[in-house]
């Protein structure tokens, strides 16, 4: 799958796509312990970034795998919500490729791969600021 440079002009910021849920762990801006993701739509992909803090640590200096998985989950669920589809995740597979460092910016994106009836296949990737693949969902 090819990657291209993203220009600001094509991106549409989404302040909080689920306004009726300001305490959402992923995108809610009122949740003091949440991820507070700021989302932006780039054509058919939903993107965000996140800088993990000490509170998100597992092994010393490394982001907890549960936080990595939560980031993948949130970006996929929010993609569907943004497209007007309310979903219930039937299953999720997270492939952790490399450790992520606390304090280092992470880039997250999701896209719909396939839709067949009620079945929707959504994918996500999480990379560090240098472009290194951290995880896939």
Task: List each model region and its residues.
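Non-catalytic linker/capping segments at the edges of enzyme domains
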Residues: 1-55
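Short, electropositive, low-hydrophobicity segments enriched in small/polar residues
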Residues: 30, 38, 62-65, 69-70, ...
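Short beta-strand micro-motifs enriched in acidic
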Residues: 40-42, 111-115
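Hydrophobic residues positioned within well-ordered beta-strands of beta-sheet architectures
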Residues: 48, 92, 108, 122, ...
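Hydrophobic beta-strand-centered segment that forms part of the acyl-chain substrate-binding groove
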Residues: 74-107, 112
